[in-house]
Amino acid sequence: MNIFSKAIIDWYKENKRELPWRESSDPYLIWISEIILQQTRVAQGYDYFLRFIKRFPDVQSLADADEDEVMKFWQGLGYYSRARNLHAAAKSMNGVFPKTYPEVLALKGVGEYTAAAICSFAYGMPYAVVDGNVYRVLSRYFGVDTPIDSTEGKKLFAALADEMLDRKQPALYNQGIMDFGAVQCTPQSPDCLFCPLAESCSALSAGRVAQLPVKQHKTKTTNRYFNYIYVRAGAYTFINKRTADDIWKNLFELPLIETSVALSEEEFLALPEFRELVAEDRKSTRLNSSHIEESRMPSSA
């Protein structure tokens, strides 16, 4: 065991977060937790995890469920493609969770990080995890300024993570470095004063903690404007099921007209798409214009 790995494991034993999925070596439970945490903070995902596994305690119960029910139990977590991928993957397992890294990696919605986490936590296999926390810790400690989102950077950090991995205790080390990045070596205001790696941290000695890790590209944002139409007929409200192949696929929503710019009420009501929608709704529900109220919400994507 190298000095870095020992410090991480020792720190983890003293500071680890008590989380329900860490009390089990069941690959199914670990898989569910990792998929939830892909786009969700631990504090938010905690209760959702407990509720989800209570209803779907194993692979077979998830595989046998209707997709609509799976989506219902995922409601509130967002990024619903994760739930659809979970359901599809469970159906492909024939009731038994795979036991090798290639098989786990082949599951729908599972990438290299998730496969490494499952295989090391559940089976004790020596696969190093590399996520945002790991990038940050390794970049700062070793003073690596190669962009983490570059091809070169991804290869470099994957090799460095593998080199630092304690092959006798891969689960402890992987959990440790992720928690270390989440709690100790945080993106903003890391606790360098009480860091067990402070004396040998390259970024700290060079005064570059705030500059590392480096990203090559900034995320490009585009403004999208979602104009939702609230159509009412007596006790009924009109909704659509999305069919577009995006993160909201198969979810229900109010009728939507998307525009590239923000529109005034007059401009919106004059849209051909709006007039067409009103005409269709009149045919199907015998509505008049007093039944239609428009509600617009801008969105960034």
Residue ranges of each PLM-predicted region?
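Basic, glycine-rich polyanion-binding accessory segments appended to enzymes
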Residues: 233, 242-286, 296
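Catalytic cores of DNA base-excision repair glycosylases
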Residues: 2, 7, 11-193, 197-210, ...
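NUDIX/MutT-family hydrolases
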Residues: 200, 296, 301
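N-terminal strand-loop-strand
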Residues: 210-256
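A short glycine-/small-residue-rich loop at the edge of a beta-strand within enzyme catalytic domains
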Residues: 186, 220, 259
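Conserved small/polar residues in nucleotide/adenosyl-binding loops
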Residues: 285-289, 301
